[in-house]
Swiss-Prot record:
Keywords for the protein's UniProt record, in alphabetical order: Repeat, WD repeat
Gene3D superfamilies: YVTN repeat-like/Quinoprotein amine dehydrogenase
Name of the protein in its database record: Probable cytosolic iron-sulfur protein assembly protein Ciao1
Recorded GO CC terms: cytosolic [4Fe-4S] assembly targeting complex; metallochaperone complex
Family according to the record: Belongs to the WD repeat CIA1 family.
Tagged with keyword Transmembrane helix: no
HAMAP family registered for this protein in UniProt: ciao1 (MF_03037)
UniProt-listed SUPFAM superfamilies: WD40 repeat-like
Chain positions of WD repeats: 12-51, 57-96, 97-136, 142-181, 188-227, 246-285, 297-331
Amino acid sequence: MGRLILEHTLQGHKGRIWGVAWHPKGNSFASCGEDKAIRIWSLSGNTWTTKTILSDGHKRTIREVRWSPCGEYLASASFDATTAIWSKHECTATLEGHENEVKSVSWSRSGGLLATCSRDKSVWIWEVAGDDEFECAAVLNAHSQDVKRVVWHPTKEILASASYDNTIKMYAESALDSDWDCTATLSSHTSTVWSIDFDADGERLVSCSDDATLKIWRAYHPGNEAGIATPDKTTVWKCVCTLSGLHTRAIYDVSWCKLTGLIASACGDDAIRIFKESSDSKRDAPSFELLTSEESAHEQDVNAVEWNPVNVGQLISCSDDGTIKIWKLQE
């Protein structure tokens, strides 16, 4: 069994904190919340301090922040129905089009595409068209309810979205006409899918839900060794593992570490849990074990968790309790 060691507890935001995002270099992070502000934090000696407060971009709660792969830009998704793009501490673009709250934003691996999703049930894909210019490339209406999260595949231009309609959708650009299409629907959860994350090579996806389960999905490509049928020669995603009975309330976020393969979950029962793939895990029927559980990680709902992309075993979390915590996993 491992354990999570609390390294830092940080305060600064007023009200609940919705999102945290490590910078690609792993030496700083951004946070956002109810106070309509984004804070950029970095390490000075052994202390994390707020270096910048970005407070003039949004009129309502900021739900999520995400750095571009190059680390030069930050995107923020807000309940004011806009997405802001920040560079060098200034808002350089505002993306408008959603009718309601924007819940999530994600950059593609190349940094050339941005995805957003909203309570208006739509997913938008934006092309970076030049300096501070973004053009809408697609509006995707595949979900029947509020869309909670969008995440790009780590190596391909494939987008995943999670929704209040209990499903996950996959999207890709058609080779024929350059239109974006929904290529797969992943159905197994019995309630809202709050968050999703790909593993390092993008062949698997983890999802977390209001149904208090984590699910692992695997991609089966045309001609796969397992003999899984792939209609129309399109990739099929199958649920290959369900982790149930370990969370007592809704699971709001999940992070699949690209360095270690460990999965962290953020739960409405105030806990953070870490899962490790079993040594005897099978490709088409994987098994995961609970490595450690930090039962009272926060005093209220844990809204987000994210593994540091560079510093192995470092985890960040934020909560309704108004704090950000930085943890180190000891295995």
